[in-house]
From Swiss-Prot:
Cofactor requirement: Zn(2+)
Pfam families: Carboxyl_trans (PF01039), Zn_ribbon_ACC (PF17848)
InterPro entries according to UniProt: AcCoA_carboxyl_beta (IPR034733), Acetyl_CoA_COase_Trfase_b_su (IPR000438), ClpP/crotonase-like_dom_sf (IPR029045), COA_CT_N (IPR011762), Znf-ACC (IPR041010)
Protein name as annotated: Acetyl-coenzyme A carboxylase carboxyl transferase subunit beta 1
One cellular component term from this protein's GO annotations in UniProt: acetate CoA-transferase complex
Provenance organism: Vibrio parahaemolyticus serotype O3:K6 (strain RIMD 2210633)
Gene name for this UniProt entry: accD1
EC numbers: 2.1.3.15
Positions of Zn(2+) binding: C29, C32, C48, C51
Renumbered residue ranges of the record's region Disordered: 288-308
Compartment list: Cytoplasm
Pathway: Lipid metabolism; malonyl-CoA biosynthesis; malonyl-CoA from acetyl-CoA: step 1/1
Amino acid sequence: MSWLEKILEKSNLVSSRKASIPEGVWTKCTSCEQVLYHAELERNLEVCPKCNHHMRMKARRRLETFLDEGNRVELGTELEPQDKLKFKDSKRYKERISAAQKSSGEKDALIVMQGELLGMPLVACAFEFSFMGGSMGSVVGARFVKAVEAAIENNCALVCFSASGGARMQEALMSLMQMAKTSAALERLSEKGLPFISVLTDPTMGGVSASLAMLGDINIGEPKALIGFAGRRVIEQTVREDLPEGFQRSEFLLEHGAIDMIVDRREMRQRVGGLIAKMTNHKSPLVVSVNESPNEEPYSVPEVDEKG
């Protein structure tokens, strides 16, 4: 065997070993570009263990990891999108729906589940961004209303994880109508004295941010989530001014009072559970106090000398 044949044999052996590694074992962080073991990333709830970058998460997995195991019931599964306008751009709307259902594995862009969080009854919903950019159409609006109705019926809180590009253009005015429809439903929830916690994840834009996503009794942002209405370039072209760096990130919004807090995804169950327990006066042994300093003495109103 010549020296050239030996080299070729070794290279073939190495390439065959590489080919034996199945796809999906490794992935790369979209922020620090660190190569990560996919199973480890899943265990860490799609948060990079190297730089803590919060990657986009599937809606179904988000709800399954957020709610307690067992007793989870999905709502609104009978609702499916329809092409009532026979809309066509570069593709027919029907074709876009079929492609999105095939790629995402979901019927539409919102999943609603009823279950428990740390032993407390809860209704939770999450947007699936891989389904047409998490856009809000008639089915999304109808499912969200079902979530509100279920929360009212069970006298419990509602939590929504938003990840959307906004209203679905293929449904025209019917998609814009969902902004008013979901807002009106939340007003009914508020009248019953039940809390709505909105968790804004990356990205939350357009008609969703301009309606239900910003109507929470408490608005929570994930770290470095993109949150806004129009994109940076559109705004700059409209106002003809340069905008500050990161002005649509959750940290900037928290600093300027647009959201109430930023919570790491890995702490979301306990933080949201603690908030709901406080807001509903629910006693649960699984809930850890949301107070950062539980040993701190409670604040007392100072007495005022009325004579002086």
